[in-house]
Amino acid sequence: MAGITDAEFLNKVIPFGFDTATLGGYSLDAKTIEASEKIIKRGRNEFHFPQDEIVNHIEKEVNLIKKQHPNVKVSANVRSTTPRPIIEVSNIDKLDIVEINCHCRQDEILAIGCGQNMLKRDDLAEYIGDVVDNASCEVSVKIRANVDGIDTLKIAKLIENTGADYLHIDAMKVGIFDADYDLLAKICSNTNIKVIGNNSIDSEKKIKKM
């Protein structure tokens, strides 16, 4: 996911063998929507919808995928400064997974404490727990690995303890143009949560390695 992933794109790639597809990332509340506007102004592609339209848009995208691929799970990657808008998205009828964005590294998102800066929140467990306890679908949390000052394994265990269904790891390692496979293996060995590995997956060889 680099900026935007929509139903049109996902419907093209699902036939290659994917059983889960992720839409997003979407900004849901006033602060994240404003941050997205700033990102767009400097030339990066971002989804941008008014706060009162975004849930309907996501629902339409979900339905476009389900119409062509009814057996594929659909996930929506979303960001918000508070849990409530994420819980609202989870109520979308055919959405299978709502994914909390704790991985975005755009400066405008970081400035409001979202994206990977979510990992620094003292109330992260409560935030995720609120979504897990009130969501109408499965919950995934996508994190960025190797963030300065953050113990990724500790965060992984925290997320597992909230009851989230999936841990999606952007296994980035600064200065290395490949996934941090050692860290992924360490997390998988020390947790029981379902782990989705990600980063630099651009070949069949890397898919098999991951």
Feature map (PLM): residue ranges:
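Hydrophobic faces of well-ordered beta-strands that scaffold small-molecule active sites
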Residues: 1, 19-24, 74-78, 98-100, ...
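N-terminal capping/small domains of soluble enzymes
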Residues: 1-84
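Catalytic cores of alpha/beta
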Residues: 6-15, 83-94, 147-161, 190, ...
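Active-site-adjacent beta->alpha loops and helix N-cap segments on the catalytic face
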Residues: 32-35, 58-59, 84, 106-136, ...
